[in-house]
Amino acid sequence: MEATFEKMFTVYGGQFGSEGKGQIVRYITGELVNKGRVYAYRIGGPNAGHTFYIGEDKIVTCQIPGPMFLAPSVVGIIGPEGVISPGMLARELQDLVQHRQRTNGGRGFQTLLIDQSAAIITDEQLAREASLVKNIGSTGKGVGAATADKVMRTGKTAKDYDFKTITDKYDLFIDIKIVDTIGWVQKQKNKGPAYAIVEGTQGAGLSLHTSGYYPHCTSRECTPQGIWAGCGLHPGMAKESESVMVIRTYPIRVAGPSGPMTNELTWEEVSRRVGREVKEITTVTKNTRRVSEIDIPELERTIAYTRPDAIALTFLDYVNSDIYKKDPRGNTLSQMYVSSIEQLLDTPVKYVGTGEGYVYQWRV
């Protein structure tokens, strides 16, 4: 059977989320936009935010695929396992339109596909999640409740929801389609070279079934296998496929009773090691994150069942503050640290990040 994509990139978190997936996705997409059509997939919902930078613009998305901000030619896809907060979706579409007006005068019509099976969050589902915030440090955004209702066949999905107030407001810039995204993409496969960039949510250490941290986990699988199923994809649909596991030098978990962390640290200790004051706040809840040393045995376990082709190592500047927002490839300490990670995990490091928006290709 003819391949749908020339190449498919899957970017997923190897720890507990907030590994910097957004900036890696932004970098890879930037390499693709001049090669052909780009389909940018996103699953998950408003309980996970992706942050990246385009020039001076700081972009945060919880619903729409981040690559849509890079070029109007990028087709955004919220997959069948997506969970949608209509209010947040509308705000992010407004951010997208405003960004395009600042950068290219709003020129170019763009397409956002929302799978007809994506779940819709209701006010009642939001209310039901209040106990999860106290018990497991959940963001309480209604994602778990909406997913549970979908499993019980009682939830509302995109095909049941009237998106007219949203589509009418942005129809001069964005064509929003509620469709069977799997079938829609298949029909486009003879229209020239196409690439897929798949933006995973959270991290493998939060996976519902395989993390080993239940009940301190999220409401889905955050592994490549789970992400592909949630998008209606498989690597066999592409002539070439590459999965990139994003990890941090100092992993984090959300605040509160969010589950075990090996060798947990204070931000004061991390700041002392880094040589400058660092403290991170969660994208969605705005609470101070928990932080720890890198956990090699946990990463070895994750690699054993997710089998990434490459690693993206972010927050390398936390190991050596001299490379903050700089190219680290000629730095001896950086080379030593990256080599040690490659040897310990028996996986090549292809990308590194050294600060907000600063990503470099370590290996070709």
Where do the PLM segments sit?
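Non-transmembrane, aqueous-exposed alpha-helical and coiled segments at domain scale
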Residues: 2-364
